[in-house]
Amino acid sequence: MLSGITTNRLMDSMDALDTILKMQREYMEMIDSRRIGERREERISKLCTAIIHEACELQNLTNWKWWKSPSIFDEEKAREELIDILHFVIQISIELGMDAKDILSAYARKNAINRERQLKGY
């Protein structure tokens, strides 16, 4: 069991992640591959740039600009921007040859490291 997650819930999560990976692969088949780049490193670099820009779009929905009058936070738009980021993160996972099991395993490993750091006052 992973941090209190039941086996059934873990399998459901894996199925959901598999579905997301499949949907992303199918979506990328629709895009002219020459637009994103020939080399894997180039594709990953462009995807990282896309993540940065989408993260800025998400940040712009918050009231981080102290010099401007605050606006109402649009949670629905924020969710949309977050999913845009997820598209690019999932595509990088695919570029790195990761499947749902690889993603979960790497996440669990890094999560354990982060938890240990917190326990040590990081």
For each predicted feature, which ranges?
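Flexible "arm" and connector segments at domain edges
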Residues: 1-122
